[in-house]
Regions:
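Conserved functional hotspots at enzyme active or ligand-binding sites that engage polyanionic ligands
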Residues: 1-114
Length: 114
């Protein structure tokens, strides 16, 4: 089971338009949530497209490290449930606490939580 904040790589990319595909997702679900199924709640990570630049639900993240790090955004409002078999078994990365706090702020606003 993947832990909250883990970056997962899709076994096959998910297409969302011409030339656009989603390869990486971040786990939003707590690892302490009862695992009654092989489903995990994730949000897509994508290139920071100009059309989405002002979208409140985007949280910046860098995939990779050092000079090879690629600036990306987590599109939190597009959260979804997916079975774990849709992802590679190895974790591709991990979000830092500051990124997770930003995700939490978006989730609270999106779901009208206090």
């Amino acid at each position: 089971m993947a832990d909250r904040g883990d970056v997962l790589t899709a076994r096959r990319t998910f297409g969302f338009g011409r030339g656009d595909s989603l390869e990486h997702f971040i786990v939003l679900q707590s690892a302490s949530f009862p695992g009654i199924s092989d489903t995990v709640v994730v949000a897509p990570i994508r290139k920071p497209l100009p059309a989405l630049a002002a979208w409140v639900g985007n949280v910046p993240i860098a995939l990779g490290s050092g000079a090879t790090a690629k600036p990306m955004v987590i599109v939190v409002p597009l959260l979804a449930a997916a079975t774990t078999d849709r992802f590679e078994p190895e974790v591709a990365g991990r979000a830092d606490p500051r990124t997770m706090a930003a995700i939490d702020r978006v989730l609270r606003a999106l779901l009208a939580l206090r």
